[in-house]
Amino acid sequence: MIHTIIKYLLISTTLFFCSCHKPKTDIITPAKQLIERQIGERAQSIHFEYIEPSEGKDIFEVIASDGRLTLRGSSSVAICYAFHTYMKEACKSMKTWSGEHITSVMPWPDYELYEQMSPYELRYFLNVCTFGYTTPYWDWERWEKEIDRMALYGVNMPLATVASEAIAERVWLRMGLNKEEIREFFTAPAHLPWHRMGNLNKWDGPLSDTWQQNQIALQHQILTRMRELGMQPIAPAFAGFVPEAFAQKHPDTQFRHMRWGGFDEEYNAYVLPPDSPFFEEIGKLFVEEWEKEFGENTYYLSDSFNEMELPIDKEDKEAKYKLLTEYGETIYKSITAGNPDAVWVTQGWTFGYQHSFWDKESLKALLSNVPDDKMIIIDLGNDYPKWVWNTEQTWKVHDGFYGKKWIFSYVPNFGGKNTMTGDLDMYASSSVKALRAANKGNLIGFGSAPEGLENNEVVYELLADMGWSSDSIDLDDWMKIYCEARYGGYPDAMEEAWKLFRKTAYSSLYSYPRFTWQTVVPDQRRISKIDLSDDYLQAIRLYASCADELKSSELYRNDLIEFVSYYLAAKAENFYKQALKDDSENRVFAAQRNLQQTVDLLMDVDRLLASHPLYRLEEWVEFARNSGTTLQEKDAYEANAKRLITSWGGIQEDYAARFWSGLIKDYYIPRIQLYFTKDRNKIREWEEQWITSPWSLSLIHISEP
């Protein structure tokens, strides 16, 4: 009793001091409106209050007593994350990509004073590639939901690259090119991320006037909402890549012709040398045109070397360091020429991905002539050194990036592949080790940069919480809270299931979590890896055994569809591998028998996934077609969307393989069937015909899976 009285005396004192300070902008209204979009009129009963940031970092408090709920925060996103935390922990409720489990308990359940400060100034989200693998054809309705979700997870620094090409077009017109020359430069929408990073030109293009205009309008809506919520979006900047027509008009400039991804030269980029006066001129124009359209911004992303090495003599170290020094200085100056207050943001992915090129002296050279307070490095993939590169984490190799500000980030998804993978133990602890490291340098942020969204929701829920935690998270405790909020209960079998998931699929990160039937034959370039162990399959059986108790939960049912589909697909995988073995040993009848077993199981998988809210080709195609304004444009966008998740282009075949209804039935199954015929050499021709032919849904959803 005494403890309670003291606690509320402290609360009252806090309230008194809070009332003496007000933020420069209204942080309450945007947060309240967002919460209303989640729970409707119930939001009217919530009290909202502003509190001062702590040491320049966001802080929030939650108090619920006698039916009165008060959310306090230092920013709109802090209040939104406070609401998300309260709903998850006190109301046992959750809203995710795949659905929701929202209890309507009123009055608001009591909840102890909950106070939390983020150890990070910035909490970053998205990946350049997300704008290809997930969002290329999204409309405002879908973007609004995603920005809401970001705020609920406490994100305050999202990437915002929509409409980059519309701005670039204006710049190139001012540089003397005509529209035809400019449009030939751009790829189709789903491949634009790689165009923006200088990896790819022309592929599946061009872009229409209508597309450019619509993207400008969409970006206005995106930025307006992000800014209302107090987010600090990262805008695109010029990275040195120019249209072929521009290179041809300036033969005296020594452009470097880059190579990437196994594409023919005509699709590869030309990059300006750093000593060209064009570099700063074009960079300045780009920032000016962007801000003329969208308003002032602080953070600008420019990546000139993503997964590409400069065509230089690697043995001449001094020449290499000199060139990198010049590039770093020129990129920085090209951005600040357009806005002196701008900060250059760059992805640190390539520093780890090509670690043999980016030794200490090379990265020091790139950074050497850029002021420490005018650059942020997103150390993108801290999960990859352990699981793929077999190196130390990049920030450790480079001593906390030599005084530059940096963000600790993960890449928990590649290509939008949606089978189960992720190292939960790492996600619950590795960033905390960085926070406490003596050589962490100027670590100011935490983030996640998935190439594809709408998958492995447990991973993103955990990462959201890590953005607000100075300590490692106890996964045993956290999983109980997660399951109770997601499913409405945590029976013993569920607990055992998740222990096994954490021991199997969620104990590691695979770059290419694909089944063999998704690649026809084993991919020797990018080795597919997926957990099919007995423990993993037992986890699915245990999860399914909770159906009677939890079947009223939408999220339980959706996860059940997903997990049982994996179970059946794993059985299909065994038959398919045997079919391949039979085929290689010329056992024709045995191969056909095992192939048919594979097909029968995969058809069951397809029927199940047709009832899942996310794992359907139908929605992917629908977004693409809805982005077109003419039949020709609709067909082109559909083909582009389907190409990305199948043949891709270059050496990226099946990189973005999806475990989706519609794709399994109409693409993966016919393709493996064709392989087991005398016409297997016609697979590429068949793929192209499927990609370029309009697809239509031919399967009825199962209402009660």
Each PLM stretch: what is its role?
Residues 517-550:
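C-terminal functional modules
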Residues 700-705:
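Residue-level detector of conserved catalytic or cofactor/ligand-binding positions
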Residues 120-139, 150:
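Active-site-adjacent substrate/metal-binding segments within catalytic domains
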Residues 21-120:
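Contiguous, structured surface segment used for ligand recognition
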Residues 553, 557-606, 665-666, 671-699:
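Ordered core of a single globular domain
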